[in-house]
From Swiss-Prot:
GO (cellular component) term, any one: cytosol
GO aspect biological process, one term: valyl-tRNA aminoacylation
Similarity field: Belongs to the class-I aminoacyl-tRNA synthetase family. ValS type 2 subfamily.
Gene: valS
Motif ('KMSKS' region): 529-533
Source taxonomy: Archaea, Methanobacteriati, Methanobacteriota, Methanomada group, Methanobacteria
Protein name: Valine--tRNA ligase
Subcellular location, record wording: Cytoplasm
EC number: 6.1.1.9
First-listed, main subcellular location of the protein, grouped into a coarse class: cytoplasm
Highest taxon of source: Archaea
Gene3D superfamilies assigned to the protein according to its UniProt record, in alphabetical order: HUPs, Isoleucyl-tRNA Synthetase, Domain 1
Domain notes: ValRS has two distinct active sites: one for aminoacylation and one for editing. The misactivated threonine is translocated from the active site to the editing site.
PROSITE patterns: AA_TRNA_LIGASE_I (PS00178)
UniProt GO molecular function: aminoacyl-tRNA deacylase activity; ATP binding; valine-tRNA ligase activity
Amino acid sequence: MTDNQIPKDYNHKNEVKWQKKWQEEDIYRFIGSGTKPRYIIDTPPPYPTGSIHMGHVLNWVYMDIIARFKRMRGFDVLFPQGWDCHGLPTEVKVEETHNIKKSDVSREEFRRLCVELTQENIRMMKEQMQRLGFSQDWNHEFVTMTPEYMRRTQLSFLRMYRDGLIYQGVHPVNWCPRCETAIAFAEVEYIENETNLNYVRFPVEGADEHITIATTRPELMAACVAVVVHPDDERFREFEDKLIEVPLFGQKVKLIKDPEVDPEFGTGAVMVCTFGDKTDVSWVNRHGLDVIDAIDERGYMTEAAGKYQGLTIAECKEKIVEDLENEGFLLKKEPVRQNVGTCWRCKTPIEILVKKQWFVAVKKLIPQVREAAEEMKWVPGHMKTRLLNWTGSMDWDWCISRQRIFATPIPVWYCSECGRVHVADEEMLPVDPTRDGPGITCECGSTEFIGEEDVLDTWMDSSISPLSVAGWPDESYRELFPADLRPQGHDIIRTWAFYTILRCMALTGEKPFSEIVINGMVFGEDGHKMSKSRGNVIAPEEVLEDYGADALRLWAAGSVPGSDVPFAWKDVKYGYKFLRKFWNAFRFISIHLTENPEVEARPMDRWILSRLMNLVAEVTESLDDYNFAAAVNRVQTFIWHDFCDEYIEAVKYRLYSDEDPESRMAAQNTLRMVLDTCLRLLAPVAPHFTEEVHQHVGEGSIHLRGWPEHIPEIVDPEIERSGDLAVEIIGEIRRFKSSSKMPLNAPLKAATIYTDNESAEMIKPFLDDIAGTMNIGDISLVAGKPEITERAVELEPRMEKIGPEFRSDAPAIISWLTGADPHEVYEEIQRNGEIEVEGNRLTMDHISFRKEVIGTAGERVDVLNLDEPEVIIEIVR
């Protein structure tokens, strides 16, 4: 092969060619025959927005590296791709796109429009995934809005309902007034903001006194059902058994005691409202208090708010504070920072409303979830603590019903006569109770039913992803369950990870996966979360256009699981530069890749091969431990420095020499082995580049090749130590040539290497390589130190010193120095610290000398030094 047959530059535009070839040949398909050990990845199903972002890239690069690595290790890998379709954002987008409200059309039509939008978004995202070279098996694609997937979701509901793990009840729930739906506690995000702590006078009945309440939510005074203080707070002892009047609204409430009150906050007296927060819920339940609904589902004040009915929460708050001040009830306002629960989708502050909803009995399953989490391997390990801490904070059951349309229907009907709940038979699934009937007669004799209009939380869909991939509930599902790996972001540990473990334990009694690898978030180059408002968003397409998928993948692989990572153009550019460096090395190597018999490897060959075997062991271990950054950095360092900068340069003279054919063949064979091994080590991270190179030197796809074998017999620590020293010597001579403005291939007349006996024995086998690499005519090795002398061969008077200091004597001094022997002048100053000239004393400050080193043979030499071990190199130009 000649390098003319290979393009001069690596062209990342060819990536698309390989992607099409991989798809056509279906090389990533899961066989499932049982002839190979299986490896199952529980792939996260993204929400189909229509475009992927850098967070997706980071997550999928992690799992794609694992999938490719495991395939090469001999596993039959099931790497599916799913789509978590249902949810409010799609409904909002459909309303915007078609300029409608969901109430303007039938539920069926609205759902059809949502499906249509989602299908198009999936198509676009699928193309983007494929453009990044991800190796999913699209034969195992799952889509949560399809009848088959909804059947599984509904079946999981029925079985958990049958086992008493799902129930319907009237309870306080987190409610988003913007989305007009209940949300789970895990979907509440807390943000810090500034508000006012209002100090309000509450009159005491039958006394000319008052209790001062500090509250950040005066708009809930209409729903005040008690005033609570700490049992040990003596300030309120006199008000025991008295009623407290709520200003503006007039209801009289009891003063109660509870140890949860913080007597140091505000005034120590707190109003209990239904409901300001979770603590209110706890107090209402503990003390048997009434419930007043002051806020409706849309965030407006109800009839209970009296004259404030119909105002928004914010409007009501402002008006009540104004009225309290006007009527003398408001004593003061203080600014305060507080954490406010918001909806994770729209960031609207949540309310707590009492609603009839469907719940998963989370608290019954917490012990099983914790046990399963302990059995799993977490990468990084400390991420397990996040899940365990979350399970320890679970006060409420999981509210799984939503007041939306585009989601999996709850398979339930209510008898029109007696209200009895009827769940679907498993054989009927999937069903839509708003459209389908139960086909039964109620125990009361009625055949009229009302279908449940609420739908399931989308986490009810995605939390059975490992079961769906395995084919549950078919008996054969246990062949593919539990999964081996769950890759996901740390931001959804308390949702997707928690719910999946909980649901799979409830449905199967088994943990859903053996290992879980957590990726971090991707920030902008400015260190902030990527957002359009900051202008720091980088779309994957921008990188693909200029640098290709592999450069982007190298950036992602350089991060550490669990840690947030800033996107950095410099890292992408470095990855691209590395690929071009490797490509150029490959072009050179390609002209020397001839078919040779096996010949004995030379010392420099043995050095690189020993280091290569260490590389194989280290990269294999790193990938087994999901330490992607260590694996990639090690491969890049080896290829760039050990292989390209050192070994290839050190064997060029052998490749072009006809004097020793076996030496040339040994170098050629070594080049082939190192190239092939490095390509396979790099293949999981840079699949396009390695495929492109492999097509010139091998057969078939590199991704169907096996992982490089670690051959212990090739590892030789002694040859590595010796080779490292030889490489250091070559590097020192190379630096000497560079600093001397000499071409690196410029010939040197001779070189003598002086060192101790042990180091001399180490260097001896590499003398030919040192001489050949640096074009040295005669090279020798001496145990000991050289006999060298330093001689001044030129001197130059420093006029800027002599003129001002010696004035009228300066011309005579210059004249004398011009005719003097430079070395005699130099020795005189060295001996006495000065020399007398025309009655004046001159030092080294007055004269510059150019010196030469004279070697053992009496010739001028250059002397180079290495410190560890001590090596002196005497160069004759």
